[in-house]
Design a protein with these regions (language model features):
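Residues immediately flanking
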Residues: 1, 48, 95, 202, ...
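Flexible loop/turn segments at secondary-structure boundaries
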Residues: 1-3, 50-54, 80-81, 206-207, ...
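Signature of N6-adenine DNA methyltransferases within the class I
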Residues: 1-190, 307-317, 354-361
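Active-site-adjacent structural elements in folded domains
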Residues: 28-29, 278-280, 346-351
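Basic, amphipathic alpha-helical recognition segments used for DNA target recognition
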Residues: 66, 318-363
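Polyanion-binding catalytic cores of nucleic-acid enzymes and NTP/SAM-utilizing transferases
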Residues: 140-319
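Amphipathic alpha-helical segments
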Residues: 365-370
Length: 370
C-alpha cells in the first residue's frame, strides 16, 4: 500500500491536471482524452466544481490547450439525481484545437425535461479570452460585462499571499475569553496584557461594521515563550519556561489540557506544544496590527467590514491588511457590482450564501485611485 506522499507524487508525474487537492474525476478527463482516436468523442457526467474551483484550474487549462469542447452543460445547484446530492455538469469533447466554448446553464427541472430544446435555445459561445480563470456560463450581456471587468485598466493588483486566514485555535473555549476572564488574568499578572488580544469573530459581523462584544484571544504561538526558529517539534523547555514565567496563563489553559491535547493528533504534542494555538499565523502576525478588511468564509449576507489596527482575526474569517486601501476595499467589495461578479466566478451554497474563499476574493477587479 502506497503512503499518501508517494501516491500524490506518482499522480503528479502521470497527470498534468493533478494537484494535491484535485478531485480524482479530473484525472479521468485527461486519461479519456489521451485514449481517444482521431474521430472519437468523450462524454462525461461529473460534478461541476471544476468550472470554478482552484483545483479545477489545471483541468480548465488542459481543455484550453488539448481539447475541442462540443457541448458543456452546467446544471448549477439543480439536483438531477435522486440518491446523490451533487451539483452536476455534462461535457462532450474531442481531441483538437480549442475554439469558442459552446455552453449553457440549466437551472430548472422543466428545462431539464426538455433538454435538447433547452440546449439549442440557451447555448452561448464564450470567447477564449475570458476563460483564463473560472469558467462562466451566462448570457451575452453578462459575458460582455465580465470581459470588461477582467480587462479593467488601472487595476490594483494584490498578491494572492496578501489575503490571509484567521487564527485557528483548535479549541475556541480555551483561547477565546470574555472581558471578565481577561481582567482576572491581567490582575494576577500585568504582563498578560501583552498576550491577550482583542479578536473579531464571524458572529460579530454586520454589513460594513461589527459588534464589539469584547471577545479576546490568548495569543500563544508555537514554542512560546521561546522565540527560536530553530526549534523543531514540541519543546519541553518551552513548556517549562511558560509555566514559570506565565503561571496564571499556564494554569488557566491547563484546565483544558485533556481537550487541547486531543486536537490534531498528528501535530499536537509533536509539532507544537499542547498549550499553543493550532495555527497562530506567526508568519504574518504583524498584519493584525494594521487596518484590515474582513469577511466570513461562509458569507450569507455579503458582509465585508473595516477592522481597525490591533484586532486579531479568528478562523471563521479571512482578511487583507492594508494601511492605505482598507476602507476603500470595504466599499468596493460590498458593492452590488462585486456581488454580481462573485455570482459569476465564485461558488454559492445551496441556500444562496456565498462561499467566499480567498482564491475567489483575491481575483476581484479593483479600480486604482490616487
Amino acid at each position: 500500500k502506497l503512503d499518501d506522499k508517494t501516491y500524490k507524487k506518482r499522480l503528479s508525474e502521470q497527470f498534468t491536471v493533478y494537484s494535491g487537492n484535485s478531485d480524482l474525476y479530473c484525472l479521468f478527463f485527461e486519461k479519456g482524452n489521451d485514449l481517444l482516436n482521431k474521430n472519437g468523442c468523450l462524454a462525461f457526467i461529473t460534478s461541476n466544481k471544476w468550472l470554478k474551483s482552484m483545483y479545477g484550474d489545471l483541468l480548465r487549462n488542459y481543455f484550453l490547450n488539448k481539447c475541442e469542447i462540443i457541448t458543456l452543460i452546467d446544471f448549477k445547484a439543480l439536483q438531477i439525481f435522486k440518491k446523490a446530492s451533487v451539483d452536476t455538469s455534462i461535457i462532450v469533447s474531442k481531441k483538437g484545437d480549442f475554439k469558442n466554448l459552446n455552453a449553457c446553464q440549466i437551472e430548472s427541472l422543466n428545462e431539464y425535461n426538455n433538454l435538447e430544446d433547452t440546449i439549442k435555445s440557451k447555448s452561448i459561445q464564450t470567447k477564449k479570452s475570458i476563460l483564463s480563470g473560472p469558467w462562466v456560463i451566462n448570457n451575452k450581456e453578462s459575458l460582455n460585462l465580465l470581459e470588461k471587468l477582467k480587462h479593467l485598466e488601472n487595476r490594483i493588483f494584490f498578491k494572492r499571499e496578501q489575503f490571509r486566514y484567521g487564527i485557528k485555535t483548535g479549541l475556541n473555549k480555551a483561547f477565546l475569553i470574555d472581558d471578565k476572564i481577561k481582567k482576572i488574568l491581567i490582575q494576577h499578572d500585568k504582563k498578560n496584557i501583552d498576550i491577550i488580544k482583542p479578536v473579531l469573530k464571524g458572529d460579530n459581523l454586520n454589513r460594513f461594521s461589527f459588534n464589539s462584544n469584547k471577545h479576546f484571544l490568548i495569543y500563544i504561538p508555537w514554542h512560546f515563550p521561546l522565540h527560536n526558529e530553530g526549534i523543531k517539534g514540541a519543546s519541553n523547555k518551552a513548556e517549562q519556561k511558560f509555566k514559570k514565567d506565565y503561571k496564571i496563563l499556564y494554569d488557566y489553559l491547563f484546565k483544558f489540557h485533556s481537550e487541547l491535547s486531543k486536537r490534531n493528533k498528528s501535530e499536537t504534542g509533536i509539532s507544537y506544544e499542547w498549550y499553543a494555538l493550532q495555527r497562530a499565523a506567526s508568519t504574518y502576525v504583524n498584519d493584525f496590527y494594521k487596518p484590515k478588511v474582513a469577511w466570513m468564509n461562509m458569507n450569507r449576507g455579503w458582509k465585508f467590514v473595516y477592522v481597525p489596527k490591533n484586532y486579531f482575526i479568528e478562523a471563521s474569517l479571512n482578511f487583507i491588511a492594508d494601511d492605505y486601501y482598507a476602507k476603500y476595499l470595504v466599499g468596493i467589495y460590498s458593492s452590488n457590482l462585486h456581488k454580481w461578479y462573485f455570482k459569476q466566478v465564485g461558488r454559492m451554497f445551496d441556500d444562496g450564501g456565498f462561499m467566499c474563499k480567498v482564491d475567489t476574493i483575491s481575483g476581484f477587479p479593483i479600480k486604482y485611485f490616487a
